[in-house]
Amino acid sequence: MAFAYYVVGSYKRNMITHDPNTNVGFDFDFNIVFNNKHGYSPAKLKNALREALNKIAKKYQFDFPEDSTRVLTLKVKDRKQSRIIYSIDLAIVNENFTKYIHFDKTYGVNEYAYKWQAMPQGYENFSIKFETLKKAGYSKELRDEYLRRKNNNRDNNIHSRDILIQTVNDLYQLKGLYLNSSSALLLGHSNMYVLK
């Protein structure tokens, strides 16, 4: 199965932060897009990625991947200190980045637990809005506001990517910026690979 990967989130935008008093490690986010010309089910795609990661995880000091509702997560842990050094989140998305494979844990791990689901509200046109804010000269204001919100966040269920997306959407609206019909989807650098 061939796939492409795209760097997403704060790493792609040079906005990774570290607060030694509160953060434990950091993470990298990637979107995986399979060349799904055979129409494989979401479960088959997720299992193919999981099996490939299982084969290489230990070689690179990762634990085996953990399956959450949205991503497969690889973690490198400092076992002596009982902490995560860093992790990688891999979301499988469709080719136009409008849906991701959702894992419904109430079904257990089976064919029916995985389905395509629309991206959460706020994800649409995120890359375009981010680039528009940068080009309009709001990079520092965006970074400062993102850091303020991230440092004030006390809810472990709210991820950095969600804080970044909300900050971009709020600042975009606050500055009165609008998408026009000629806006193009800005994608990150991708590489093509084949799972064996």
Can you say where each PLM-predicted feature lies in the sequence?
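Active-site nucleotide-donor binding segment shared across nucleotidyl transfer reactions
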Residues: 1-28, 32-39, 43
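Extended aliphatic helical segments
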Residues: 7-8, 24, 33, 71, ...
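Conserved catalytic core of two-metal-ion nucleotidyltransferases
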Residues: 46-98
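Short, surface-exposed, charge-dense and proline/glycine-enriched linear segments
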Residues: 28-39, 91-105
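Glycine-rich loops and low-complexity Gly/Arg-rich segments
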Residues: 29-33, 55-58, 113-120
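The feature captures the alpha-helical scaffold/lid subdomain characteristic of nucleotidyltransferase
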Residues: 1-3, 43, 63, 84-87, ...
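Residue-level signal for functionally critical sites in structured catalytic/ligand-binding pockets
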Residues: 10, 16, 29, 73, ...
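Short, low-complexity, polar/charged sequence segments that are solvent-exposed and flexible
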Residues: 24-26, 49-52, 108-112
